[in-house]
């Protein structure tokens, strides 16, 4: 493969960012970008810097689904964000089911002894790691 993939956990106020290694085997946290989706501030200025730095071949967005698998308003917002992202940066966009990733991220931080006030700073980028890692695992090359 030898190309990176960015993983994004898109919310209404933040975007958690993760990146794969060059082999597409592991995901690492990058940062959390503050956005204001209602005001149309999508964090694309900062994403442009990260895209230039990491040169990803693709971006994977978390797709929030209901527990029964149906897509709701948040999934529609994620797909809209993905369309805008693809148009802005001419990158392939893929989607990964993100059910329970934020809960998993919070559990990891709690188990790691991270204080409540510090968890908020890390939860979105850790959720982005889980989204991207799930995608990488599902699309791993079979050797």
Curated annotation (Swiss-Prot):
Transmembrane segments: none annotated. SMART domains: YqgFc. The keyword Lipid biosynthesis does not apply. Coiled coil: none annotated. GO terms for molecular function: nuclease activity. Gene3D superfamilies: YqgF/RNase H-like domain (3.30.420.140). Its main location: cytoplasm. Could be a nuclease involved in processing of the 5'-end of pre-16S rRNA. Belongs to the YqgF nuclease family. PANTHER family: POLYNUCLEOTIDYL TRANSFERASE, RIBONUCLEASE H-LIKE SUPERFAMILY PROTEIN (PTHR33317:SF4). This is Putative pre-16S rRNA nuclease. It comes from Lactococcus lactis subsp. cremoris (strain SK11). The lineage of its organism: Bacteria, Bacillati, Bacillota, Bacilli, Lactobacillales.
């Amino acid at each position: 493969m030898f190309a990176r993939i960015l993983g994004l956990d898109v919310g209404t106020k933040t975007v958690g960012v993760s990146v794969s290694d060059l082999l597409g085997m592991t995901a690492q946290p990058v940062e959390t970008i503050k956005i204001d989706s209602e005001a149309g501030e999508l964090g694309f200025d900062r994403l442009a810097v990260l895209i230039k730095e990491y040169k990803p071949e693709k971006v994977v967005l978390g797709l929030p689904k209901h527990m029964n698998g149906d897509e709701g308003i948040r999934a529609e917002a994620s797909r809209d964000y993905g369309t805008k992202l693809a148009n802005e940066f001419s990158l392939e966009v893929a989607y990964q089911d993100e059910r329970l990733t934020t809960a998993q991220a919070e559990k990891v931080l709690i188990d790691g002894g991270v204080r409540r006030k510090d968890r908020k700073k890390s939860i979105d980028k850790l959720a982005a790691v889980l989204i991207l890692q799930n995608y990488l695992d599902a699309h791993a090359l079979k050797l």
